Amino acid sequence: MAPARAFVLVLLAVASASTAAANTATTTPTNPVAAPTQWQKAHATFYGGADASGTMGGACGYGNLYSQGYGTRNAALSTALFNDGASCGQCYKIACDRKRAPQWCKPGVTVTITATNFCPPNWNLPSDNGGWCNPPRPHFDMAQPAWEKIGVYSAGIIPVIYQRVPCVKKGGLRFTINGHDYFQLVLVTNVAAAGSIKSMEVMGSNTADWMPMARNWGAQWHSLAYLTGQGLSFRVTNTDDQTLVFTNVVPPGWKFGQTFASKLQFK
């Protein structure tokens, strides 16, 4: 897994009228917010140790899951669910399937996790004996504390039922700026509702138009424009086709490595 990165969290003041106005522009969603999906069958294993420290980093690019607010309720998704990183940030409610393995299930409990990593295939092992994340299997390799909420430790792997659910977050979206001149790499975290981002655009305070950003990997988006020193605005569309505009959420004079918090959130 990628090493965890330390980020400086810079909270923007929201008391002034100008800042309040800067973070209230929205675009009417073309689709309603998605309801929880139907329950589906899968399997789940665990990794990362009892404190989930081994889950830090990962293919979604969140880095330190503790400091980013994802904690120990996270999981790596198999190819069938990961969608080349487009599923990063999505939330799933998972229960052990007592109909298939009552002896390994803790009754009457569910756990909700966030997709933060990718569980790669292991083509050296059969899909039903070690190659748990091989396509086309839907599989969750969960942080151990989350897995132990629903399964008996000695089982190692359990059948589960799962449904995708809206993510619940406190506060607004956060934007971490990394990279260098002519390459801004923006990590978007703390995304509620759909949890995952479909598209993203950026506008500098000295530019006239929105410029599309590209998914670099996981929840990281990049722009190749020269925007150093400019205030930055973002137009973000989630996978439920809701759009929010974060006007001047990053002030002029920002530095690479800083994180900027907005008060806007998907609902």
Curated annotation (Swiss-Prot):
Name of the featured protein: Expansin-A23
Every Expansin-like CBD domain range: 182-262
Any single Gene Ontology cellular-component annotation: extracellular region
GO BP terms: plant-type cell wall loosening
Name of the gene this protein is made from: EXPA23.1
Gene3D superfamilies from the UniProt entry: Expansin, cellulose-binding-like domain, RlpA-like domain
Organism: Oryza sativa subsp. japonica (Rice)
Protein's job: May cause loosening and extension of plant cell walls by disrupting non-covalent bonding between cellulose microfibrils and matrix glucans. No enzymatic activity has been found. May be required for rapid internodal elongation in deepwater rice during submergence.
Entry membrane topology: Peripheral membrane protein
Signal peptide: 1-21
Residues in Expansin-like EG45 domain copies: 57-172
Top-level lineage group: Eukaryota
SUPFAM superfamilies on file: Barwin-like endoglucanases, PHL pollen allergen
Subcellular location field: Secreted, Cell wall; Membrane
Annotated keywords: Cell wall, Cell wall biogenesis/degradation, Membrane, Secreted, Signal
Record carries keyword Signal: yes
SMART domains associated with the record: DPBB_1
Main location: secreted
UniProt cross-references to InterPro entries, sorted A to Z: Expan_Lol_pI, Expansin, Expansin/allergen_DPBB_dom, Expansin_CBD, Expansin_CBD_sf, RlpA-like_DPBB, RlpA-like_sf
CDD domains, per database record: DPBB_EXPA_N
Family: Belongs to the expansin family. Expansin A subfamily.
